[in-house]
């Protein structure tokens, strides 16, 4: 087993602590995994807490902010190993297209990829949050598709995403979903999303 790493080279630097969107780095070299975007998007299998969703931005699988801001990492040479290189399609994936993936398409698209760890429902849950954080009406078709997915986890987070878009069309989609949805958690998310419209200072209704 590896020996515990005890050497401290951080000095007075707090860049990683300051940059973390969810304030997951709670003390010197201590991370609260329950707040870490990498944990939330990969390891957490259930619903992501609502208060953390806006802080996740467009991260859909992991997060490297703390690594990117670390001065020491800036001195590390780039790896020439091809296996570590990301495909162009993985750098800026089309979130709408990801929401269209069925189970077999998901497994084919991410074959031999660590993305399989989060499973389809986990990835599309994350995509729904990213689309909601985008807040653009162009996200509505993908979120509407997510709202009728067979997985309650995807439906519930798609409802939240529609609440963030806050247009009349999004509102109508959520209201219509109330008449057909039966899952208690999804219904709760739909009602919360509808109430979010009323809290906005200038909802587009």
Regions found by a protein language model. Give the residues of each.
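Conserved nucleotide- and phosphate/pyrophosphate-binding catalytic cores
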Residues: 84-96, 116, 129, 138
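Glycine-rich adenosyl-nucleotide cofactor-binding module
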Residues: 1-18
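C-terminal amphipathic alpha-helical segment
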Residues: 52-84, 101, 105-116, 122-129
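Iron-sulfur cluster-binding cysteine motifs and their immediate structural context
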Residues: 15-39, 59-83, 142
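Structural detector for internal amphipathic alpha-helices that build alpha-solenoid repeat scaffolds
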Residues: 124-135, 145, 155-167, 187-200
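Short inter-helical turns and helix N-cap capping residues of alpha-solenoid HEAT/ARM repeat scaffolds
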Residues: 120, 150-152, 182-183
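Amphipathic alpha-helical scaffolding segments comprising HEAT/armadillo-like alpha-solenoid repeats
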Residues: 105-109, 136-148, 167-179, 201-205
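Short, charged low-complexity linear segments at domain edges
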Residues: 1-5, 33-52, 103-107
């Amino acid at each position: 087993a590896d020996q515990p790493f005890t050497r401290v080279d951080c000095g007075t630097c707090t860049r990683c602590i300051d940059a973390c969107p969810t304030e997951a780095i709670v003390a010197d070299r201590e991370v609260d995994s329950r707040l870490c975007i990498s944990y939330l998007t990969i390891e957490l299998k259930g619903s992501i807490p609502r208060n953390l969703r806006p802080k996740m931005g467009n991260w859909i699988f992991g997060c490297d902010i703390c690594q990117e801001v670390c001065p020491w990492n800036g001195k590390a040479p780039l790896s020439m190993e091809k296996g570590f290189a990301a495909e162009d399609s993985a750098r800026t994936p089309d979130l709408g297209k990801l929401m269209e993936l069925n189970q077999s398409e998901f497994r084919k698209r991410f074959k031999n990829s660590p993305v399989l760890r989060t499973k389809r429902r986990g990835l599309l849950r994350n995509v729904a949050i990213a689309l909601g954080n985008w807040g653009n009406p162009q996200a509505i078709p993908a979120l509407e598709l997510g709202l009728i997915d067979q997985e309650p986890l995807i439906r519930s987070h798609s409802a939240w995403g529609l609440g963030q878009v806050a247009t009349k069309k999004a509102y109508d989609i959520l209201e219509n979903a109330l008449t057909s949805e039966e899952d208690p958690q999804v219904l709760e998310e739909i009602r919360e999303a509808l109430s979010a419209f009323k809290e906005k200072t200038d909802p587009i209704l």
